[in-house]
Amino acid sequence: MNILDQLDAKSLRDDVPDFRPGDTLNVHVNIVEGNRSRVQVFKGFVMGRQGSGVRETFTVRKVSFGVGVERTFPVHSPIIDKIELVSRGDVRRAKLYYMRDRHGKAARIREKRESSASSK
């Protein structure tokens, strides 16, 4: 293991939940305005994940006042306070770029139903 791999391993976060494209997330982001810092929540669905390791990013999309807003976050960034998984989505694609062209009911993502082994 070389020096760069060791530095990358130190920078990885261990509190990242297991999320996939289609899942709905609350991303708590630290915003610095002048000398004050506050936490802003960005809620939307995951459009995709790119990269691996320290350089891994994910894109979250939401519709705010009729305007689609997409934001790309580094997974292991220190500006992210925490990531909450709200619900799981049932999709068949790794990248949900087709959702940009959908409006209204067509823009909905089915919720994934968890199968329980104890119900048999």
Swiss-Prot record:
A GO MF label: structural constituent of ribosome
InterPro entries: Ribosomal_bL19, Ribosomal_bL19_CS, Ribosomal_bL19_sf, Translation_prot_SH3-like_sf
Keywords of the record: Ribonucleoprotein, Ribosomal protein
Gene Ontology biological-process annotations: translation
Keyword Ribosomal protein attached: yes
Record-level GO cellular component terms: cytosolic large ribosomal subunit
Record function comment: This protein is located at the 30S-50S ribosomal subunit interface and may play a role in the structure and function of the aminoacyl-tRNA binding site.
Protein family per UniProt: Belongs to the bacterial ribosomal protein bL19 family.
The protein, known as: Large ribosomal subunit protein bL19
Source organism phylogeny: Bacteria, Bacillati, Actinomycetota, Actinomycetes, Micrococcales
Gene: rplS
